[in-house]
Amino acid sequence: MNLWVTGYRSYELGVFNSKDKKVEVIKYALQKKILEKLDEGLEWVITGAQMGIEQWTCEVVAEMKKEYPELKLAIMMPYSEFAGNWNEANQESFSIRCSLADFVGEVSKEKYKSPMQLKNYQNFMLDHTDQAMLIYDPEHEGKTKYDYEMIKKYSEQEDYSYDLVDMYQLQEFAEMYQEKDSF
């Protein structure tokens, strides 16, 4: 099974530092959800490279591969030179995440030209995955809204399921994480 993982950008969560406790909780949630999917036959985690959920997913999967070497990570970008306009620190972070992946690719070999490239990216991700997992809450909109709407519509027409980890579930994961740390 191939799983598309996406979600909030770091700034949408108010995270501006990788040492923020929210990042630890989100990584914990990602790990727990990916472990569930491994039991269902997960082989590939396919994600983008946006700062936030997607890059944290790369870190989590890279760490999990030590214990689950059969797990693979692919990073797909909607167009070439995806991180080209990012500052140096973010570009370095992007490069590090890409080095963790088993496969890195671009849906369009051209630089950004139009929103159609983003639509093509969504279609590519849907065509190359069996399920999606979103760290996203429709009550707290962000840029992931567009992926969520596309996935929801697609799942109504195709045999495609998705997990939505909303703010309530993130709070539950935060409590589990805190309990784990207190032992």
UniProtKB/Swiss-Prot annotation:
Disulfide bonds: none
Stored InterPro entries: YspA (IPR010697)
Pfam families recorded: YpsA
Entry superkingdom: Bacteria
Family from the record: Belongs to the UPF0398 family.
Protein name, per record: UPF0398 protein LSL_0930
Species this chain originates from: Ligilactobacillus salivarius (strain UCC118) (Lactobacillus salivarius)
